[in-house]
Amino acid sequence: MGSTCSSPESKEQNRINSIIDKQIRKDEDNEIGNQKLLLLGTGECGKSTILKQINILHSSGYTKTDLKNVAGTVYSNIIQGMATLIKAKDQFYHEVTSPELDADAQHILALAESSKDAMPFIPLTFNSIKRLWHDPTVQKTFERRAEFQMMDTLVYFMNEIDRINDPEYIPTVDDMLRIRIPTMGVVQQVIEIKGTKFRIFDVGGQRSERRKWIHLFDNVNATIFISAINEYNQKLNEDGNANRMKESIKLFETICNSRWFVQAAMILFLNKRDLFEQKLKTTSINVLFSTYLGSNDYAECVAYIQLRFERLNKYADVKKIYTHVTCATDTNQIQLVIDSVVDMVIGRNLRGTGME
């Protein structure tokens, strides 16, 4: 009779195969009930800030070590922001500055060009930043910031510059929410909210990053599309001729009507409402929307922009857009909005499974 015994190598391979099969089945089981949520939008619309808020509200938040580790990013954001202002000033104005201010500008530009990680400010750097910030020509340039690409958060950090310059400086949670690190590729986080696990994906919003979205589109439960509504008079970083809000509206139309998202909940965050309200005091949305004949009233302008987005939905008879007007750095407001979104997504899932 032939032997039915297996070799030791065969037994070991079978054991390994069994472990792999069990892990695959476990992963598949873990997928059941999970909600897949995409954060989409153009660059610098606030996607990463929303994900940080979700982490603060529904996960482990940020430890003291986490906060210490982003101090270099705060310093870098300030240096890069000031360098952007200096370059724009030189482009817009050709006024003769004092030798001291010229030296300050050259010092900051050299730091911005350095490949080294940003370090705590030495007295020369700190004093250069403050002198430049208070220079009238720099302030005139800052007032024209819609004409060039600049981080929204520079004003916040400049208002906190003395605290940030403290030798014992540790960034606060508010600082963490405002730092700018461009999302390259895809960032995934698994967070349990109200007993349901959400796999949340934050994907790069720059044009060059959008091609990386495609593999995420299968089995999406909900998409949060974020648009910074204060950008109606600003140019795109990747294309100085393209309006940022026009780009956002165009991308939303593509996402909203994509075959990939027919079954997914479509949630729209009209973000940066605080900056939008402030900008309306000096600049009408008519600069982009020539057919808008209303006033600069905040509520009226928000309603108009909301309509411009929502009317792009070609499946309005079967698909609703859930719109929220947000300020991503306002933790209390974002908590209410995220709770509402989670309840809606869970409710849709229960109805879809016949369990509600």
Curated annotation (Swiss-Prot):
Residues 326-331 are annotated as: G5 motif. Residues 267-274 are annotated as: G4 motif. Residues 36-49 are annotated as: G1 motif. Residues 33-356 form the G-alpha domain. One of its GO terms (molecular function) is G-protein beta/gamma-subunit complex binding. A lipid is attached at G2 (N-myristoyl glycine). A lipid is attached at C5 (S-palmitoyl cysteine). Mg(2+) binds at S48, T183. GTP binds at residues 41-48, 177-183, 202-206, 271-274, 328. One of its GO terms (cellular component) is heterotrimeric G-protein complex. It comes from the Eukaryota. One of its GO terms (biological process) is adenylate cyclase-modulating G protein-coupled receptor signaling pathway. Residues 175-183 are annotated as: G2 motif. Keywords: GTP-binding, Lipoprotein, Magnesium, Metal-binding, Myristate, Nucleotide-binding, Palmitate, Transducer. PANTHER family: GTP-BINDING PROTEIN ALPHA SUBUNIT, GUANINE NUCLEOTIDE-BINDING PROTEIN ALPHA-15 SUBUNIT. Belongs to the G-alpha family. This is Guanine nucleotide-binding protein alpha-15 subunit. It comes from Caenorhabditis briggsae. The gene is gpa-15.
